[in-house]
Amino acid sequence: DVLGSRGLGDVYKRQGKKPCLSLRELEKQVNTDLDMLVNIVDGQMTVCELVDRYLKTKTGVRQSTKQGYVTMQRLLAKESFGKKTIRSVKTSDAKLFLIKLQQEDGKSYSSIHTIRGVLRPAFQMAVDDDILVKNPFGFQLAGVLVNDAVTREAISKDQMRKFLKFVHDDVVYCKYYEVVYILFHTGMRISEFCGLTLKDIDLENRTVNIDHQLQRTSDMRYIIETTKTDAGTRVLPITEDVAQMFQAIIEDRNAPKVEKSIDGYRGFLFYDDNGMPLVAMHWQHRFNHMVGRYNDIYRVQMPNITPHVCRHTYCSNMAKSGMNPKTLQYLMGHSDISVTMNVYTHIGFDDAEEELKRMEEFRKAQAEVEQKKEKPMSQKMFKVV
Protein backbone atom coordinates (compact mmCIF):
# COMPACT_ATOMS: atom_id res chain seq x y z
CA ASP A 1 0.00 0.00 0.00
CA VAL A 2 1.04 3.67 -0.26
CA LEU A 3 2.09 3.78 3.37
CA GLY A 4 4.39 0.78 3.13
CA SER A 5 4.63 -2.06 5.61
CA ARG A 6 4.89 0.10 8.72
CA GLY A 7 1.19 0.88 8.96
CA LEU A 8 -0.82 3.89 10.03
CA GLY A 9 0.07 3.61 13.69
CA ASP A 10 3.76 4.06 12.99
CA VAL A 11 3.06 7.04 10.76
CA TYR A 12 1.15 8.83 13.48
CA LYS A 13 3.82 8.08 16.06
CA ARG A 14 6.48 9.50 13.78
CA GLN A 15 4.45 12.63 13.14
CA GLY A 16 4.00 13.19 16.86
CA LYS A 17 0.19 13.10 16.81
CA LYS A 18 -1.33 13.31 20.26
CA PRO A 19 -3.63 10.39 21.23
CA CYS A 20 -6.35 12.81 22.29
CA LEU A 21 -8.34 12.90 19.05
CA SER A 22 -11.72 11.22 18.99
CA LEU A 23 -12.06 8.11 16.85
CA ARG A 24 -14.12 10.01 14.29
CA GLU A 25 -11.59 12.84 14.11
CA LEU A 26 -8.76 10.35 13.80
CA GLU A 27 -10.56 8.52 11.02
CA LYS A 28 -11.15 11.80 9.17
CA GLN A 29 -7.51 12.77 9.50
CA VAL A 30 -6.33 9.38 8.28
CA ASN A 31 -8.61 9.61 5.24
CA THR A 32 -7.32 13.10 4.47
CA ASP A 33 -3.71 11.96 4.65
CA LEU A 34 -4.49 8.89 2.55
CA ASP A 35 -6.16 11.03 -0.10
CA MET A 36 -3.12 13.30 -0.23
CA LEU A 37 -0.72 10.36 -0.48
CA VAL A 38 -2.78 8.84 -3.31
CA ASN A 39 -2.85 12.20 -5.07
CA ILE A 40 0.93 12.36 -4.85
CA VAL A 41 1.20 8.96 -6.47
CA ASP A 42 -1.17 9.63 -9.37
CA GLY A 43 -0.26 13.31 -9.78
CA GLN A 44 -3.74 14.63 -9.00
CA MET A 45 -2.70 16.81 -6.07
CA THR A 46 -4.25 20.29 -6.34
CA VAL A 47 -2.38 23.56 -5.99
CA CYS A 48 -4.04 24.13 -2.59
CA GLU A 49 -2.94 20.69 -1.40
CA LEU A 50 0.60 21.30 -2.62
CA VAL A 51 0.80 24.63 -0.79
CA ASP A 52 -0.60 23.06 2.39
CA ARG A 53 2.00 20.31 2.18
CA TYR A 54 4.81 22.81 1.54
CA LEU A 55 3.80 25.01 4.47
CA LYS A 56 3.95 22.00 6.79
CA THR A 57 7.70 21.97 6.11
CA LYS A 58 8.05 25.60 7.22
CA THR A 59 8.61 25.23 10.94
CA GLY A 60 9.97 27.82 13.34
CA VAL A 61 8.67 30.81 11.38
CA ARG A 62 7.58 34.09 12.97
CA GLN A 63 4.00 34.79 13.96
CA SER A 64 3.67 37.47 11.28
CA THR A 65 4.90 34.97 8.68
CA LYS A 66 2.34 32.41 9.84
CA GLN A 67 -0.41 34.99 9.43
CA GLY A 68 0.77 35.61 5.89
CA TYR A 69 0.59 31.89 5.15
CA VAL A 70 -3.00 31.70 6.42
CA THR A 71 -3.97 34.65 4.22
CA MET A 72 -2.32 32.95 1.26
CA GLN A 73 -4.18 29.68 1.87
CA ARG A 74 -7.52 31.48 2.11
CA LEU A 75 -6.88 33.32 -1.14
CA LEU A 76 -6.00 30.13 -3.02
CA ALA A 77 -9.05 28.33 -1.64
CA LYS A 78 -11.29 30.93 -3.31
CA GLU A 79 -9.49 30.81 -6.66
CA SER A 80 -10.15 28.29 -9.42
CA PHE A 81 -6.37 28.17 -9.84
CA GLY A 82 -6.11 26.63 -6.38
CA LYS A 83 -8.28 23.71 -7.48
CA LYS A 84 -6.18 22.89 -10.54
CA THR A 85 -4.07 19.75 -10.39
CA ILE A 86 -0.41 20.62 -10.21
CA ARG A 87 0.45 18.53 -13.29
CA SER A 88 -2.01 20.58 -15.36
CA VAL A 89 -0.41 23.92 -14.43
CA LYS A 90 1.68 25.34 -17.27
CA THR A 91 3.99 28.35 -17.10
CA SER A 92 1.41 30.40 -19.01
CA ASP A 93 -1.24 29.41 -16.41
CA ALA A 94 1.02 30.63 -13.63
CA LYS A 95 1.66 33.95 -15.39
CA LEU A 96 -2.02 34.50 -16.19
CA PHE A 97 -2.97 33.78 -12.57
CA LEU A 98 -0.58 36.45 -11.28
CA ILE A 99 -1.74 38.91 -13.97
CA LYS A 100 -5.35 38.31 -12.91
CA LEU A 101 -4.48 39.06 -9.30
CA GLN A 102 -3.06 42.44 -10.32
CA GLN A 103 -5.35 43.57 -13.14
CA GLU A 104 -8.71 42.13 -12.06
CA ASP A 105 -8.41 41.70 -8.30
CA GLY A 106 -6.35 44.85 -7.69
CA LYS A 107 -3.61 43.13 -5.70
CA SER A 108 -0.45 45.18 -5.27
CA TYR A 109 2.86 44.14 -6.79
CA SER A 110 4.34 43.53 -3.35
CA SER A 111 1.39 41.30 -2.35
CA ILE A 112 1.70 39.23 -5.53
CA HIS A 113 5.45 39.03 -5.02
CA THR A 114 4.74 37.49 -1.60
CA ILE A 115 2.21 35.03 -3.07
CA ARG A 116 4.69 33.97 -5.75
CA GLY A 117 7.24 33.62 -2.94
CA VAL A 118 5.18 30.68 -1.62
CA LEU A 119 4.02 29.16 -4.91
CA ARG A 120 7.45 28.98 -6.52
CA PRO A 121 9.16 26.98 -3.72
CA ALA A 122 6.02 24.84 -3.31
CA PHE A 123 6.17 23.79 -6.95
CA GLN A 124 9.93 23.38 -6.68
CA MET A 125 9.30 20.92 -3.86
CA ALA A 126 7.10 18.93 -6.25
CA VAL A 127 9.96 18.96 -8.78
CA ASP A 128 12.42 17.79 -6.12
CA ASP A 129 10.00 15.01 -5.15
CA ASP A 130 9.93 13.84 -8.81
CA ILE A 131 6.22 14.61 -9.11
CA LEU A 132 6.82 17.35 -11.69
CA VAL A 133 9.53 17.79 -14.28
CA LYS A 134 9.49 21.60 -14.43
CA ASN A 135 8.54 24.43 -12.08
CA PRO A 136 5.84 26.56 -13.79
CA PHE A 137 6.69 29.48 -11.48
CA GLY A 138 10.38 29.52 -12.37
CA PHE A 139 10.16 32.87 -14.18
CA GLN A 140 10.99 36.45 -13.25
CA LEU A 141 8.14 38.84 -12.45
CA ALA A 142 9.69 41.60 -14.56
CA GLY A 143 7.80 41.81 -17.83
CA VAL A 144 4.83 39.91 -16.42
CA LEU A 145 3.57 42.41 -13.83
CA VAL A 146 3.70 46.17 -13.54
CA ASN A 147 5.86 47.09 -10.56
CA ASP A 148 3.67 49.65 -8.81
CA ALA A 149 5.49 49.31 -5.49
CA VAL A 150 6.23 52.66 -3.90
CA THR A 151 9.88 52.97 -2.95
CA ARG A 152 10.32 54.18 0.61
CA GLU A 153 12.83 56.92 -0.03
CA ALA A 154 14.92 58.67 2.55
CA ILE A 155 14.09 62.34 2.93
CA SER A 156 16.69 65.09 2.64
CA LYS A 157 18.45 66.65 5.61
CA ASP A 158 16.55 69.89 4.99
CA GLN A 159 13.21 68.06 5.00
CA MET A 160 14.19 66.23 8.19
CA ARG A 161 15.15 69.50 9.86
CA LYS A 162 11.87 71.19 8.85
CA PHE A 163 9.75 68.24 9.97
CA LEU A 164 11.51 68.00 13.34
CA LYS A 165 11.05 71.74 13.89
CA PHE A 166 7.36 71.46 13.03
CA VAL A 167 6.82 68.58 15.47
CA HIS A 168 8.80 70.40 18.17
CA ASP A 169 6.78 73.62 17.82
CA ASP A 170 3.31 72.14 17.26
CA VAL A 171 1.05 72.35 20.32
CA VAL A 172 -0.55 68.97 19.56
CA TYR A 173 2.33 66.86 18.28
CA CYS A 174 5.19 68.25 20.37
CA LYS A 175 4.68 65.34 22.80
CA TYR A 176 5.99 63.01 20.08
CA TYR A 177 9.12 65.05 19.32
CA GLU A 178 11.52 62.86 21.32
CA VAL A 179 10.33 59.70 19.55
CA VAL A 180 10.62 61.24 16.08
CA TYR A 181 14.09 62.56 16.93
CA ILE A 182 15.26 59.16 18.21
CA LEU A 183 14.01 57.32 15.12
CA PHE A 184 15.74 59.81 12.82
CA HIS A 185 19.02 59.58 14.76
CA THR A 186 19.31 55.87 15.58
CA GLY A 187 17.76 54.04 12.62
CA MET A 188 15.95 51.63 14.93
CA ARG A 189 13.15 49.51 13.54
CA ILE A 190 9.87 50.72 15.01
CA SER A 191 9.09 47.27 16.46
CA GLU A 192 12.50 47.36 18.17
CA PHE A 193 11.72 50.78 19.63
CA CYS A 194 8.27 49.63 20.82
CA GLY A 195 9.89 46.65 22.53
CA LEU A 196 12.38 48.73 24.52
CA THR A 197 12.04 48.55 28.30
CA LEU A 198 13.67 50.61 31.03
CA LYS A 199 16.25 47.86 31.52
CA ASP A 200 17.37 48.18 27.90
CA ILE A 201 18.38 51.84 28.22
CA ASP A 202 21.71 52.67 29.89
CA LEU A 203 21.94 56.46 30.05
CA GLU A 204 25.17 56.41 32.05
CA ASN A 205 27.08 54.47 29.40
CA ARG A 206 24.90 55.84 26.61
CA THR A 207 23.87 52.50 25.12
CA VAL A 208 20.60 50.85 24.13
CA ASN A 209 20.26 47.06 24.20
CA ILE A 210 18.26 45.66 21.27
CA ASP A 211 17.57 41.93 21.48
CA HIS A 212 13.80 41.66 20.93
CA GLN A 213 10.82 43.38 19.34
CA LEU A 214 7.20 43.90 20.31
CA GLN A 215 4.47 42.77 17.90
CA ARG A 216 0.68 42.63 17.93
CA THR A 217 -0.93 39.84 15.94
CA SER A 218 -4.05 40.07 13.78
CA ASP A 219 -6.09 38.55 16.62
CA MET A 220 -4.86 41.36 18.93
CA ARG A 221 -2.38 39.29 20.92
CA TYR A 222 0.79 41.02 22.13
CA ILE A 223 3.93 38.97 21.64
CA ILE A 224 7.69 39.38 22.02
CA GLU A 225 9.80 38.10 19.15
CA THR A 226 13.52 37.98 18.53
CA THR A 227 15.04 40.63 16.29
CA LYS A 228 14.44 40.37 12.55
CA THR A 229 17.89 38.85 11.97
CA ASP A 230 20.72 37.65 14.18
CA ALA A 231 22.55 40.84 13.25
CA GLY A 232 19.56 42.78 14.57
CA THR A 233 20.55 41.78 18.10
CA ARG A 234 23.01 44.50 19.02
CA VAL A 235 24.05 47.06 21.62
CA LEU A 236 23.49 50.47 20.09
CA PRO A 237 25.74 53.36 21.16
CA ILE A 238 23.83 56.64 21.30
CA THR A 239 24.91 60.27 21.20
CA GLU A 240 24.40 62.75 24.02
CA ASP A 241 21.41 64.39 22.31
CA VAL A 242 19.68 61.02 21.79
CA ALA A 243 20.38 60.13 25.44
CA GLN A 244 18.66 63.37 26.46
CA MET A 245 15.60 62.38 24.41
CA PHE A 246 15.41 59.02 26.18
CA GLN A 247 15.84 60.79 29.53
CA ALA A 248 12.87 63.04 28.75
CA ILE A 249 10.73 60.05 27.72
CA ILE A 250 11.57 58.18 30.92
CA GLU A 251 10.83 61.21 33.10
CA ASP A 252 7.44 61.77 31.41
CA ARG A 253 6.58 58.07 31.23
CA ASN A 254 2.92 57.49 32.06
CA ALA A 255 2.77 53.82 32.96
CA PRO A 256 -0.23 52.02 34.51
CA LYS A 257 -0.06 51.20 38.22
CA VAL A 258 0.25 47.53 37.39
CA GLU A 259 2.32 47.02 34.27
CA LYS A 260 1.24 43.96 32.34
CA SER A 261 3.96 41.47 31.44
CA ILE A 262 4.32 40.54 27.78
CA ASP A 263 6.15 37.22 27.50
CA GLY A 264 8.15 38.14 30.61
CA TYR A 265 8.87 41.73 29.56
CA ARG A 266 7.53 44.81 31.34
CA GLY A 267 8.57 48.43 31.77
CA PHE A 268 7.81 49.60 28.22
CA LEU A 269 8.19 53.30 27.38
CA PHE A 270 4.67 54.04 26.10
CA TYR A 271 1.22 52.69 26.94
CA ASP A 272 -2.27 53.22 25.53
CA ASP A 273 -5.41 54.04 27.52
CA ASN A 274 -5.99 50.34 28.18
CA GLY A 275 -2.61 49.93 29.84
CA MET A 276 -1.11 48.04 26.90
CA PRO A 277 2.23 49.01 25.33
CA LEU A 278 2.14 50.93 22.07
CA VAL A 279 2.96 48.98 18.91
CA ALA A 280 4.12 49.92 15.41
CA MET A 281 0.59 50.63 14.15
CA HIS A 282 0.08 53.36 16.77
CA TRP A 283 3.19 55.22 15.64
CA GLN A 284 2.34 54.70 11.97
CA HIS A 285 -0.98 56.47 12.52
CA ARG A 286 0.67 59.29 14.47
CA PHE A 287 3.20 59.88 11.71
CA ASN A 288 0.36 59.99 9.18
CA HIS A 289 -1.41 62.63 11.25
CA MET A 290 1.75 64.70 11.71
CA VAL A 291 2.57 64.72 8.00
CA GLY A 292 -1.05 65.53 7.16
CA ARG A 293 -1.04 68.46 9.56
CA TYR A 294 2.26 69.74 8.16
CA ASN A 295 0.93 69.63 4.59
CA ASP A 296 -2.24 71.45 5.64
CA ILE A 297 -0.10 74.35 6.87
CA TYR A 298 2.77 74.64 4.40
CA ARG A 299 2.62 75.17 0.64
CA VAL A 300 5.71 73.06 -0.04
CA GLN A 301 4.43 69.58 0.76
CA MET A 302 6.30 67.04 2.85
CA PRO A 303 6.56 63.53 1.32
CA ASN A 304 5.12 60.57 3.19
CA ILE A 305 7.17 60.03 6.34
CA THR A 306 6.86 56.79 8.28
CA PRO A 307 8.96 55.24 11.03
CA HIS A 308 10.66 53.17 8.35
CA VAL A 309 11.43 56.28 6.30
CA CYS A 310 13.19 57.59 9.42
CA ARG A 311 15.31 54.43 9.36
CA HIS A 312 16.11 54.90 5.66
CA THR A 313 17.02 58.52 6.30
CA TYR A 314 19.38 57.71 9.16
CA CYS A 315 21.19 55.10 7.07
CA SER A 316 21.43 57.47 4.11
CA ASN A 317 22.75 60.34 6.25
CA MET A 318 25.38 58.14 7.87
CA ALA A 319 26.53 56.81 4.49
CA LYS A 320 26.77 60.34 3.06
CA SER A 321 28.80 61.46 6.07
CA GLY A 322 31.45 58.88 5.17
CA MET A 323 30.79 56.30 7.89
CA ASN A 324 32.55 52.97 7.39
CA PRO A 325 30.07 50.60 5.67
CA LYS A 326 30.70 47.77 8.15
CA THR A 327 30.05 50.13 11.06
CA LEU A 328 26.83 51.26 9.42
CA GLN A 329 25.82 47.65 8.82
CA TYR A 330 26.22 46.95 12.55
CA LEU A 331 24.24 50.02 13.60
CA MET A 332 21.40 49.16 11.22
CA GLY A 333 21.34 45.51 12.26
CA HIS A 334 21.61 44.24 8.68
CA SER A 335 22.70 40.65 8.15
CA ASP A 336 23.99 41.44 4.65
CA ILE A 337 26.16 44.44 3.77
CA SER A 338 24.49 44.61 0.35
CA VAL A 339 21.23 45.56 2.09
CA THR A 340 22.99 48.47 3.72
CA MET A 341 24.60 49.66 0.51
CA ASN A 342 21.92 48.93 -2.08
CA VAL A 343 18.58 49.21 -0.36
CA TYR A 344 18.85 51.83 2.37
CA THR A 345 21.41 54.21 0.89
CA HIS A 346 19.89 56.74 -1.48
CA ILE A 347 22.52 58.75 -3.35
CA GLY A 348 21.20 61.20 -5.95
CA PHE A 349 22.47 63.95 -8.25
CA ASP A 350 22.59 66.57 -5.50
CA ASP A 351 24.68 64.28 -3.32
CA ALA A 352 27.07 63.52 -6.18
CA GLU A 353 27.38 67.23 -7.01
CA GLU A 354 28.07 68.09 -3.37
CA GLU A 355 30.71 65.36 -3.11
CA LEU A 356 32.49 66.62 -6.24
CA LYS A 357 32.50 70.16 -4.85
CA ARG A 358 34.04 68.89 -1.62
CA MET A 359 36.74 67.07 -3.56
CA GLU A 360 37.43 70.17 -5.66
CA GLU A 361 37.75 72.35 -2.54
CA PHE A 362 40.07 69.77 -0.99
CA ARG A 363 42.30 69.75 -4.08
CA LYS A 364 42.46 73.56 -4.11
CA ALA A 365 43.40 73.67 -0.42
CA GLN A 366 46.01 70.97 -0.98
CA ALA A 367 47.49 72.92 -3.91
CA GLU A 368 47.70 76.10 -1.80
CA VAL A 369 49.55 74.27 0.96
CA GLU A 370 52.03 72.80 -1.51
CA GLN A 371 52.55 76.20 -3.12
CA LYS A 372 53.38 77.78 0.24
CA LYS A 373 55.93 75.05 0.93
CA GLU A 374 57.81 75.91 -2.27
CA LYS A 375 60.24 78.83 -1.81
CA PRO A 376 60.10 81.43 -4.58
CA MET A 377 63.19 81.42 -6.78
CA SER A 378 65.15 84.75 -6.91
CA GLN A 379 68.22 86.05 -8.77
CA LYS A 380 70.26 85.91 -5.54
CA MET A 381 70.02 82.13 -5.60
CA PHE A 382 72.28 82.02 -8.67
CA LYS A 383 76.03 82.50 -8.46
CA VAL A 384 77.66 84.60 -11.09
CA VAL A 385 80.30 82.53 -12.80
Name the predicted role of every residue range.
Residues 205, 218, 223-233, 240-242, ...:
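C-terminal secondary-structure termini that scaffold catalytic or DNA-interacting sites
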Residues 1-15:
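Single conserved hydrophobic/aromatic residue that forms the stacking wall/gate
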Residues 105, 165-176, 186, 236, ...:
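Short, basic (Lys/Arg/His-rich) helix/loop patches that form interaction surfaces
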Residues 200-207, 323-345:
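Short, polar N-cap/turn motifs at the start of nucleic acid-interacting alpha helices
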Residues 144-147, 191, 204-237, 241, ...:
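Basic, Lys/Arg-rich DNA-contacting stretches centered on the C-terminal catalytic core
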Residues 18-19, 40-43, 52-131, 149, ...:
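N-terminal core-binding DNA-recognition domain of tyrosine site-specific recombinases/integrases
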Residues 146, 154, 213-216, 332-358:
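Catalytic-site neighborhood detector that most strongly recognizes the C-terminal catalytic loop/helix
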